[in-house]
């Protein structure tokens, strides 16, 4: 839960621009829009949704949506327990790059495609890490992030490794 001490851009819910009910409705609308666009993409690519490949991708997409929701919502959000980096690396790096390749090429990605997947994953985690470094003071006692576990100096070294790993 963010508070007034948090640095960075203001959020609609935090500032009172949206009510909790409006935010929940917005989440539902965006989830449905994402699911429908994913289904349409799979239908266009595979010509059906009722084969093994599209079904596996539907399950993977549902896991990604569920992971996004559980990241900060619910009684025990994993993004506040220091697991956000791993999730971002998996979903924004490996799943997005390798999944997109599979949707287009209809073939299992070769090992060489792990290179761009890992690069995108590293850069994505780098964005998260910069935000978490910025919020170390305001997050204290509220959530646990990688910079809180390893300290700001360690997080800067980690960030350098992420960016270097992406290159």
Which residue ranges define each predicted feature?
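Residue-level hotspots within pore-lining transmembrane alpha-helices
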Residues: 87, 91, 119-122, 126
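Hydrophobic membrane-spanning alpha-helices of multi-pass integral membrane proteins
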Residues: 93, 162-167
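Short, hydrophobic/aliphatic alpha-helical segments
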Residues: 65-72, 117, 123, 137
């Amino acid at each position: 839960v963010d508070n007034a001490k948090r640095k960075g851009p203001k959020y609609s819910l935090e500032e009172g621009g949206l009510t909790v009910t409006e935010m929940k409705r917005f989440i539902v609308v965006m989830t449905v829009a994402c699911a429908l666009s994913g289904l349409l993409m799979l239908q266009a690519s595979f010509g059906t949704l009722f084969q093994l490949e599209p079904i596996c991708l539907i399950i993977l997409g549902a896991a990604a949506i569920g992971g996004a929701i559980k990241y900060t919502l619910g009684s025990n959000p994993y993004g506040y327990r220091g697991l956000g980096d791993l999730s971002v690396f998996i979903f924004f790096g490996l799943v997005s790059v390798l999944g997109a390749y599979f949707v287009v090429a209809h073939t299992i990605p070769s090992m060489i495609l792990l290179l761009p997947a890992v690069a995108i994953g590293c850069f994505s985690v780098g964005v998260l890490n910069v935000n978490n470094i910025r919020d170390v003071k305001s997050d204290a006692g509220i959530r646990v992030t990688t910079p809180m576990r390893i300290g700001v100096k360690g997080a800067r070294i980690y960030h350098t490794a992420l960016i270097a790993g992406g290159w």
